[in-house]
Amino acid sequence: DDDVIGTAFYLMEFKDGRVLWDAAMEDSDKDEAFGVYKSMNDSMAKLHLVNPSEIGLEDFGKPGNYVGRQVSRWSKQYVDSETENIDSMNCLIDWLPKNLPSEKRTGIVHGDYSLTNVMIGKNDPNVIAILDWELSTLGDPCADFNYHCLQYIMNPKLADKDYCRNQGIPVIDEYVKMYSEKINVDLTEEWDLYSAYNLFKLAGILQGILGRVRDGTAAHENAAERASGVRNLS
């Protein structure tokens, strides 16, 4: 309501907690590491089970075909920002629209759910706040959860199941099962499709950064180094 202070605004509740930066939880004991991951899983499932229309968010985004629209968006960004020809990216641009996962339901998706975007209690491992909602919209909750799980691919320690077990972190199969049971959806059949889409999306994001480096508009001085790896992701 612009009339309150003359412009758009929002209210944010203060939370007294911690933001942890190491997804491998190397500075935590096994109990805390497991508790943090369990609470992240619980919080994401609770978000995805919210019915948007019951809280006045039925117009928060376009319903349906979320992954298809995202594939189109990131394909365009990749092409517009292309700095080299990558055959595997070209193949994905052609293949993904023909092999989209089935969207079982529409819910509120965060868009960038990760350990660094949640706040943990000061004296316990529970998620007390979810941060950074600028990518949130209506979409496919399963795609949102799969994007969150890319950490198990991108982080070498989390990709090591023995490391996870020794550290108290659920391995990827256990973590997916925990979530699936909460939302009552079997993710195993289309998990690889979601992973292909999300890795493509991440490659598109990184290519966009490389495009800004090419055009001289990148904000970060190390942008080119940070955005390397498009070919490996594809």
Question: In which residue ranges do the predicted regions lie?
Answer:
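Catalytic-loop of the protein kinase fold
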Residues: 108-110, 115
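Catalytic activation segment of kinase domains across protein kinase-like and atypical kinase folds
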Residues: 119-148, 154
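All-alpha amphipathic helical-bundle segments outside canonical DNA-binding/catalytic cores
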Residues: 61-62, 186-197
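Glycine-rich "substrate-gating" loop/helix at the edge of Rossmann-like oxidoreductase active sites
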Residues: 31-33, 133-137, 166
